[in-house]
Amino acid sequence: MATHSTNEFRGGLKVMVDGDPCSIIDNEFVKPGKGQAFNRVKFRNLKTGRVLERTFKSGETLPAADVVEVEMQYSYNDGEFWHFMTSENYEQHAASKEAVAEAKQWLKEEALCMVTMWNGVPLSVEPPNFVELKITETEPGVRGDTATGGTKRAKLETGAVVRVPLFLNEGEIIKVDTRRGEYVSRAK
């Protein structure tokens, strides 16, 4: 099994810590004036979602996590699980509420997502960077309301709430950046 030394640690690297797959969020190399250098590492447990911090002596190694990033199509939510399907062999996988986490507000049927798999189980779901969603609820924008561009709250078809310009109305389809949760433009 492959291992990673502390000098290879970087954000996004997947390693095994205490038997669980983890993703490194932040790695800080510390060389004190006296004593051995060490790495202060912040990582997210991919099974539980908890963020932990630990220090490793310089030169220590951790086994690589055997996780796979697979592009899958979102099919449906049955109330308990979110179901995804691979494009190649149409294999179905059910992701738990913990695996979907914040991505659920951007998931629309047939959307392509990156799913992190470990031992055949979905651990995390990353929605596409941009999604096109319909505005289902917003206040009507009044012309002449502001001297400069103003915004209002709009509820989208997936339940997400974003700030949109005053000129947008219910029923319009907009493009949203899922990484920041912000309005980008009207859909073409």
Swiss-Prot record:
Any one GO cellular component localisation term in the record: cytoplasm
Keywords noted in UniProt: Cytoplasm, Elongation factor, Hydroxylation, Protein biosynthesis
InterPro entries: Elong-fact-P_C, NA-bd_OB-fold, Rib_uL2_dom2, Transl_elong_fac_P/YeiP, Transl_elong_KOW-like, Transl_elong_P/YeiP_cen, Transl_elong_P/YeiP_CS, Transl_elongation_fac_P
Alphabetized Pfam families for the sequence: EFP (PF01132), EFP_N (PF08207), Elong-fact-P_C (PF09285)
Coiled coil regions, renumbered to chain: none
Function statement: Involved in peptide bond synthesis. Alleviates ribosome stalling that occurs when 3 or more consecutive Pro residues or the sequence PPG is present in a protein, possibly by augmenting the peptidyl transferase activity of the ribosome. Modification of Lys-34 is required for alleviation.
Name assigned to this protein: Elongation factor P
Organism (species): Coxiella burnetii (strain CbuK_Q154) (Coxiella burnetii (strain Q154))
High-level lineage: Bacteria, Pseudomonadati, Pseudomonadota, Gammaproteobacteria, Legionellales
